[in-house]
Swiss-Prot record:
Catalysis performed (reactions): sn-glycerol 3-phosphate + an acyl-CoA = a 1-acyl-sn-glycero-3-phosphate + CoA
Top-level taxon of the source organism: Bacteria
Associated pathway: Phospholipid metabolism; CDP-diacylglycerol biosynthesis; CDP-diacylglycerol from sn-glycerol 3-phosphate: step 1/3
Disulfide bonds: none
Keyword Transmembrane helix applies: no
Protein name: Glycerol-3-phosphate acyltransferase
This protein's domain notes: The HXXXXD motif is essential for acyltransferase activity and may constitute the binding site for the phosphate moiety of the glycerol-3-phosphate.
Biological processes annotated in GO: CDP-diacylglycerol biosynthetic process; fatty acid metabolic process; phospholipid biosynthetic process
InterPro entries: GPAT/DHAPAT (IPR022284), GPAT/DHAPAT_C (IPR045520), GPAT/DHAPAT_LPLAT (IPR041728), GPAT_PlsB (IPR028354), Plipid/glycerol_acylTrfase (IPR002123)
MF terms (GO), sorted A to Z: glycerol-3-phosphate O-acyltransferase activity
Stored CDD domains: LPLAT_DHAPAT-like
Protein's organism: Haemophilus influenzae (strain ATCC 51907 / DSM 11121 / KW20 / Rd)
GO CC annotation, single: plasma membrane
Length: 810
């Protein structure tokens, strides 16, 4: 019988290799699932299928996993390397598969009793033939069900390129023996647990059935909240109920997605072509976190940072290829233009107006629609920053969508809701040229199909893209930890805990996004070149600085989620030089090669520097203090950092608390000393003159931030009673003048938002009294600290500009 099965498998191999593509999930199971290939592996499949076996085996061999067709030999005993939980259909089905599997499990458990070093890993594996969830009003089942031979043939032809082999987290038999013993009941329990796992996996791969859009509209329009809003609309505008209902339907039609699985499959092919045209690879990290949440039945809300319009497509593409359901995406109404709007809608986009404050009907409809998505179990994605960052830094969170998410939890949401922060990064952002023009004062160009095509047509060779899933926040757990009484007050429309919770969770999302930063060659090369006054370094200096950056990021990690490049500084530089339209040039003179950043590209490069500025700000501050004092006691350095840190924390969403800050600073000092960038003797730190250039380049990352803080603080010294609005305006004007006089290219240097953030942090740190008047003692102490870290030339320019401004206004 075994020979016939092998012959049959060989017959299947040729057509299947032509029709079915290798699509393993995850892409590298050994690394991502932490598999120990030195211990025996047993693959657990849901049911007997020779077609599935051939596809699954081919993927195993391609991934360097043990061949499932061979047997495990343990202490002279040979046992199968795979088991089936259930019988299959038609040819070669395994009668008594359940009993056979239990027997094999028992034999493996018996071996664990006699060999203490043995740890067999059970890996659930399933082959997913297409992933259409089906429609609510149709009786068909998704194609993950058990298929017969004829159905498999059609599936191979139709879904061949959309067939995935899903490897799940391994179960340690050693752990099972230690925790539960090794009798026969444990073997049966293992089989039951594996069956439940496959059932959950099917749901996590396809998601709930797609809704009948019209039926969904009818249900929503009959909801109490929307009916009340319609009545209020009719009364306030003095129109009939019928007219208000038509307006409500129109709004709902404007908002709602119209997902089509066939459209998703088509765009998947297009996106595969697009990424290959534009990028040399998409690096995905920590997706296992999300798969775990999906298997546990969580309602998942993806909250990525927003760099580019292409973020919408990238995250859905990545999730689809990680075996997860692409989410419903909250997209700006500006993207609802022909023909993109209709296409986006079919891929899961639902549209939101930029502002709907005061529009009670729109607000009620949008809130109920979002709540309905949660209720039906669809994952959702929204951009908490509200719009794309033009500077490369995270923007302050807009809390409207988070507020509606918490309202959904508050109003009888039965499944746990987990927020998944996502870091999205690129070595070249498609719209970066447009951002630079807008920051120079050009009007924002309205989105249209022609603009999209023009951008894509002229770009290629953009390096790599990065998607890193940050630490999830399960809302009920967060609320129970920080607002223990939240359930008791849940009957109130807007309980006391609600607004602080929305603000705190939104802030924590930003912190977790930054904790998941993916550092790339472009970030590091750009940071080094922008740290030089002339935006140029010798090749040797640049490579030395890149090495210093790389060593510190590895030895003093910002967080365990940060992803670092694993190539040499030389390889990083060559990679950046090979990218198109970057503006990094090599020039030669009698002394060697100089790497230079074109002046016109300086503003563009600050975008990539700013992506990872939060990772460098503390080492830059340490370097800046030591450089300006030349020699300083550790205690004094720590004292200066403690004064400045709260403002950096608020502006850049840093995650260190006071105790963690002290540990991080000491580790940075030790690393600088290890690199011989500074001298460290007991409680005394000083510059190492032979490495002072490295220290100067490190310190440059803080200069513009300190200068901005100094501008605002100096204005407050001169005008302690100034209003917040005037303080923001005055700070911005002084910064603009300083940027012109001293050639500062950073686009955020005179951005009103960063001054607003700093002033808000001053208030939070009690630099203003209850009446809003400046607490001069505290401000003067902060001004003194800042003035010691800024050049005399800059200090004089700031003071002179402020005095001139006062003269003009008097």
């Amino acid at each position: 019988m075994a020979n016939f099965i092998n012959m049959y498998r060989q017959l299947l191999s040729l057509p299947l290799s032509a029709l079915v593509k290798n699509n393993p999930i995850p892409a590298n199971p050994i690394e991502e699932l932490s598999l120990n290939i030195h211990q025996p592996i047993v693959y657990v499949l849901p049911y007997t299928s020779q077609t599935d076996f051939v596809i699954f085996r081919r993927n195993c061999l391609a991934l360097g996993l043990p061949d499932p067709a061979e047997k495990n030999e343990i202490n002279g005993v040979k046992l199968p390397r795979y088991v089936y939980l259930d019988e299959g259909r038609r040819i070669f089905k395994s009668k008594g598969a359940k009993d056979e599997t239990t027997t094999i499990f028992n034999k493996y458990l018996e071996l664990h009793r006699t060999s203490e070093s043995l740890d067999v890993q059970l890996i659930p594996v399933s082959v997913l033939w297409g992933r259409s969830p089906g429609q609510e009003d149709k009786s068909d089942l998704p194609n993950l069900r058990l298929l017969n031979g004829i159905q498999k043939t059609f599936a191979a032809i139709w879904f061949g390129r959309d067939t995935f082999v899903r490897f799940s987290q391994a179960v340690s038999l050693r752990y099972m023996v230690v925790e539960h013993g090794s009798d026969e009941k444990i073997a049966q329990k293992l089989a039951r647990v594996a069956k439940m796992h496959f059932a959950k996996q099917r749901i996590s791969a396809t998601g709930p059935r797609l809704p009948n859009r019209q039926a969904m509209f009818n249900k929503l329009l009959q909801s109490e909240a929307i009916r009340r809003a319609i009545e209020d609309e009719a009364k306030s505008k003095n129109i009939s109920i019928e007219k208000a209902q038509k307006e409500a339907y129109k709004i709902l039609d404007e908002i709602a997605a119209d997902v089509s699985h066939s459209s998703l499959r088509a765009v998947d092919r297009f996106l595969r072509w697009l990424w290959n045209k534009l990028y040399s690879g998409i690096n995905v990290q920590n997706s296992n976190r999300v798969r775990k949440l999906a298997l546990e039945g969580h309602e998942i809300v993806y909250v990525p940072c927003h760099r580019s319009h292409i973020d919408y497509l990238l995250l859905s593409y990545v999730l689809y290829h990680q075996g997860l359901v692409p989410p419903h995406i909250a997209a700006g109404i500006n993207l609802n233009f022909w023909p993109i709007g209709r296409m986006f809608r079919s891929w899961g986009a639902f549209f939101i107006r930029r502002t709907f404050k005061g529009n009670r009907l729109y607000s009620a409809i949008f809130r109920e629609y979002l709540s309905e998505l949660f209720h039906r179990g669809y994952s959702v994605e929204y951009f908490i920053e509200g719009g794309r960052s033009r500077t490369g830094r995270l923007l302050a969170p807009k809390t409207g969508m988070m507020s509606m998410t918490l309202q959904a939890l508050q109003h009888s949401q039965t499944r746990p809701i987990s927020i998944v922060p996502v870091y999205v990064g690129y070595e070249h952002v498609l719209e970066v040229d447009t951002y630079a023009k807008e920051l120079r004062g050009a009007a924002k160009e309205k989105e249209n199909a022609g603009l999209v095509l023009r951008v894509i047509k002229k770009l290629r060779n953009l390096g790599q893209g990065f998607v890193n899933f940050g630490e999830p926040i399960t809302l009920s757990n967060y609320l129970s930890q920080h607002f223990p009484d939240w359930k008791e007050q849940n009957h109130e429309e807007k309980p006391q805990w609600f607004t602080p919770a929305v603000n705190n969770i939104s802030k924590q999302v930003m912190i977790n996004i930054n904790k998941a930063a993916a550092v790339n060659s472009m970030n590091l090369v750009g940071t080094a070149l922008l740290s030089s006054r002339q935006r140029a370094l010798s090749r040797e200096q640049l490579l030395e600085q890149l090495s210093s950056y790389q060593q510190l990021l590895q030895n003093v990690p910002y967080s365990t989620d940060v992803v670092l490049p694993n190539v040499t500084p030389q390889a990083m530089l060559e990679h950046v030089l090979a990218l198109d339209r970057i503006g990094v040039l090599i020039e030669k003179d009698n002394f060697g090669e100089i790497v230079r950043l074109e002046r016109s590209s300086a503003v563009l490069m600050t975008y990539y520097r700013n992506n990872i500025q939060h990772l460098f700000v503390l080492p830059s501050l340490v370097a800046s203090i030591i450089l300006h004092y030349e020699a300083i006691q550790k205690d004094l350095l720590l004292d200066a950092i403690r004064k400045i840190y709260p403002f950096l924390q608020g502006e850049l969403f840093l995650h260190f608390n006071e105790d963690e800050l002290n540990v991080q600073i000491h580790q940075i000092i030790n690393e600088f000393a290890r690199q011989s960038v500074i001298n460290s003797n007991d409680n005394f730190l000083s510059i190492n003159k032979s490495k002072v250039r490295i220290l100067q380049l490190w310190s440059a990352g803080m200069l513009e931030i300190l200068q901005r803080y100094y501008i605002t603080v100096t204005i407050l010294q001169k005008q302690p009673a100034i209003s917040r609005a005037e303080l923001e305006k005055e700070s911005q004007l002084v910064a603009q003048r300083l940027s012109v006089l001293h050639g500062i290219n950073a686009p955020e240097f005179f951005d009103k938002a960063v001054f607003s953030s700093f002033i808000a942090n001053l208030k939070e740190q009690r630099y203003f009294d209850e009446s809003g008047y400046t607490v001069l003692d505290k401000i003067e102490e902060l001004a003194s600290t800042l003035s010691h870290l800024i050049s005399t030339e800059i200090c004089l320019t700031v003071k002179g500009t402020i005095e001139k401004s006062e003269d003009l206004s008097s």
